[in-house]
Swiss-Prot record:
Catalytic activity reported: an N-acyl-L-alpha-aminoacyl-tRNA + H2O = an N-acyl-L-amino acid + a tRNA + H(+)
Protein name: Peptidyl-tRNA hydrolase
Gene that this sequence comes from: pth
Organism (species): Burkholderia mallei (strain NCTC 10229)
Annotated function: Hydrolyzes ribosome-free peptidyl-tRNAs (with 1 or more amino acids incorporated), which drop off the ribosome during protein synthesis, or as a result of ribosome stalling.
Keyword terms, alphabetized: Cytoplasm, Hydrolase, RNA-binding, tRNA-binding
Subunit structure: Monomer.
GO biological process terms, semicolon-separated: protein quality control for misfolded or incompletely synthesized proteins; rescue of stalled ribosome
Entry's EC annotation: 3.1.1.29
Site label Stabilizes the basic form of H active site to accept a proton, positions: D93
Length: 201
């Protein structure tokens, strides 16, 4: 069963529409669907809501610590409510998936994502669920003929808003991910994963 859903992003209006905040977009949508309001909760270092989703009580969290310190918020809430790593789902932007793709998986490395790296360090575990929301990679914007030796600026890419066509694809992927949330929250995470991946996300 999933008891805590975390969306990763950076705090501040200047980051709201940037690719790195895709995790926030998903949690914002979940809160809206539940009629819950995310409020600043200092003991959890983020915006927090307790929501009733699909008949289950679920904690929603958006760390306000900046991305590379996200673990501080996650571990504070997980310890307070005695939530196990396997009961946590972290939604985050994923460079290695194109816009329009979303994948669910349990465990694994950080893939260079500083938010995941910090969460794994604070939990002393990598065994939590990740919802990877594809944002594409800056190398995809470089003409193939010019890619050899090119060094795409990843930091600049993730801190910029997606193009309109990319945003539409990302929004569609988030909708597909939301459609499998009832299954995931009730603990049928493997089934949710198969549904999401089968639906072309």
């Amino acid at each position: 069963m999933i008891k805590l859903i975390v969306g990763l992003g950076n705090p501040g209006a200047e980051y709201t529409a940037t690719r790195h905040n895709a995790g926030f977009w998903l949690v914002d949508q979940l809160a809206r669907e539940a009629g819950a309001t995310l409020r600043d909760e200092r003991r959890f270092h983020g915006f927090y809501a307790k929501a009733r989703l699909f008949g289950e009580e679920v904690h929603l969290l958006e760390p306000q610590t900046y991305m590379n310190r996200s673990g501080q918020a996650v571990v504070a809430l997980a310890h307070f409510f005695k939530i196990l790593p396997t009961e946590i789902l972290v939604a985050h932007d994923e460079l290695d998936l194109p816009p329009g793709a979303a994948k669910l998986k349990l465990g694994g490395g950080s893939g260079g994502h500083n938010g995941l790296k910090d969460i794994s360090a604070h939990l002393s575990s990598q065994q939590y669920w990740r919802l990877r929301i594809g944002i594409g990679h800056p190398r995809d914007l470089i003409p193939e003929s010019a890619r050899a030796g090119a060094k795409p600026d990843v930091a600049n890419f993730v801190l910029k808003p997606p193009r309109k066509d990319e945003q539409d694809l990302i929004d569609a992927a988030i909708e597909r991910a939301l459609a499998v949330m009832p299954t995931a929250i009730k603990g049928e995470t493997e089934r949710a994963m198969m549904q999401l991946h089968r639906n072309g996300a």
